[in-house]
């Protein structure tokens, strides 16, 4: 029989690593509570049509990377490759953005893309998503960027990340620019890299995102998207930059930042780092004011971003910003296996009364000698002995495992007071 192993591109989070996730998730919740965003939990499976209509048929994600399957009813379903589309579907289906309602939401969970696995890029990966609906003005753009900035500051990595900004303008602006870009690139067709040639027909704007040096040289003299953007949208982008200056948020302009999802309009942004090699983007987002309407809802202003949690953890680890793991328990009980009906009741009562304490015991209930060895290895400060003699006398034995103090006796009805000290 063959050995069962994990699927390529997927990862187990082992007990020794789970504390890193708990640390990061606690910081995420701290920041989002500060900005009064509400958590939502979304299904990992959606109808395939949702992503075809939102992410885009011609996008790399839909054309090459989704996990699609048919259920027993013959419906085409997809493991979600990103969270925004599902969040918009939920907002529409539950009438959360009608009649001028506003929503500030966040979610965190696994996404799935069939990509070549490498450091920082996996086939199952976790994303934090932050989405806001019903806000037209610049203030929400600034708030969403400030949320990411606040999280990076809370984690102690703000000096190692860079905010990159661009504006994609309106859909009409992009159509006009796309034609100008295609006209410019026509003489260079044979010199473009293979991926860029494929994108000429499907999604020409994505050529701007090419990392191939030869293609970048060709693009150096290409028409600039900003020159095709309406005056009011250019002014809005300029004002956004001015407000970021006032907030003290560092940024740089990136005219080639276009994002790989078709639904973005207006402001787009990424937070990047030079500490993770080729997987430099740890956060990306922007406005998607047309998506709610495109998916059947009312016309609704929208903006959001996603953070790759694994990449963020890699960065925290690389910079030494993760706390040390503390698996030590506070109290270790040494029990007589012949009297468990009494001693376990005492232990459970203490767990209920003092929930902040980490309490452990040897559930194999070996000899007292072997239990004391496990108590020493547990890192506990105190061992509490409850054997036959202790039960007969009404006192628990107290041994201090990390201090040179004599063993004490404490009455069972005083144990809680003793442990609270």
Curated annotation (Swiss-Prot):
GO MF annotations in UniProt: ATP binding; histidine-tRNA ligase activity
Keywords attached to this entry: Aminoacyl-tRNA synthetase, ATP-binding, Cytoplasm, Ligase, Nucleotide-binding, Protein biosynthesis
Keyword Mitochondrion: no
Reaction catalyzed: tRNA(His) + L-histidine + ATP = L-histidyl-tRNA(His) + AMP + diphosphate + H(+)
Enzyme Commission number: 6.1.1.21
Alphabetical list of PROSITE patterns matching this protein: AA_TRNA_LIGASE_II
Species, as recorded: Francisella tularensis subsp. novicida (strain U112)
One CC-aspect GO term: cytoplasm
Official protein name in the record: Histidine--tRNA ligase
Keyword Transport included in the entry's annotation: no
Alphabetical list of Pfam families matching this protein: HGTP_anticodon (PF03129), tRNA-synt_His (PF13393)
Protein family (similarity comment): Belongs to the class-II aminoacyl-tRNA synthetase family.
InterPro entries linked: aa-tRNA-synth_II (IPR006195), aa-tRNA-synth_II/BPL/LPL (IPR045864), Anticodon-bd (IPR004154), Anticodon-bd_dom_sf (IPR036621), His-tRNA-ligase (IPR015807), HisRS-like_core (IPR041715), HisRS/HisZ (IPR004516)
Gene that encodes it: hisS
Highest taxon, organism lineage: Bacteria
Cell location: Cytoplasm
One of the protein's GO biological processes: histidyl-tRNA aminoacylation
Subunit and partners: Homodimer.
